Structure formats: structure tokens, C-alpha cells
């Protein structure tokens, strides 16, 4: 994110309105880059090995034209809260894009960025995009809007650093403001939608990551 002095302040914002979550990053904070990442994430912690499906609609309120800007769904190996480090912050998979919409989903595998196929459909400010992330014992399936489903190469485990848990949720990086709505989470075949089940899950998330 640019150093410890860049973590706090008003450059990172998060609001919850009913079942909608709006995340925003301004002033060039955070990035998706070849050797290191900086991002804001609203997440829930799941036991490693949990089968899950997370879906949401992402409404892009604003999105800068920069190769390091990104937003979407993410599952990752480790979570660092209000922390600035110089090393890559664990492996992950992301239902999102980078390089100004050129990439259809990506991840970080063994510390290296891994890109899915080229995107054929790009999204920007004013657009709403359907996002879907599926995690099973065989790997991950990623769906970013009307682009082709990405799964090849996303079969690595997210347990190299934290072998007990994975961290699943929504993220934004570098000059993006996005509202996530119609959120649905399924774990081990037990459906939790906008009712009490999901509310309990995200209340737990709010305790882990207060605003």
C-alpha cells in the first residue's frame, strides 16, 4: 500500500448498507503488481478444505485506468490486517481483472502472478458484473462476467502459510470504488443467502475487520 503511513486515514473506505458492501480505495493506495500487492479486503475465514461457492454482483462506481487497479472476489492463503510488508502477501485466486481489463481472472501461485485467459469482455465505471468463485478439493473455478470460465492452472492449495484457514471475500486495489450486492455464500453444500445464515457470517467478518 506504500508503507505504514499509507494504511490509515481516509484513503480506504468500507460501508455496509443492508446486504450491500461498498469498498473504496483512493490516492493511488494499493496495487496488484508483479512482486507485491496492496489491497483492501472484506472477508470471512473458512477452515482449509471447505468446499464453497461465493457469488455477487459488482457495480463499478469508479475505476481508474491503471494496470495495477483491480476489484472482485478473492480467496487467499493468509490475511494481513493494517500491515505493510515488502514481501508478497501469500498465494491467492481472484475473480477480477488487471492490466486495464486485459486479464480474465488471475492469482498468485508460489509468490508469482498467474494470469487466466485474455478477457474478451471489459467492464468499467457504470457497469455491473456478475462474479462467481468456486473452491473444491480439485481447485478453483472463476467466472468474471461474460468472459469464459477460468479454471486451468488454478488448482493449487492456499495453505502454504496458514494451513488451517483460507480467507474468502471481496477486494479492491488502487483507485477503485465498487458496491457488491446479491451476495450468496454456500459452504459444503449448505446454502446461506441474504437471510440469517449469511448475516451471521458477515457479522463475524465485521468483528474481524472493523470499519
Task: Write out the residue ranges for each language-model feature.
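Extracellular glycan-recognition regions
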Residues: 1-211
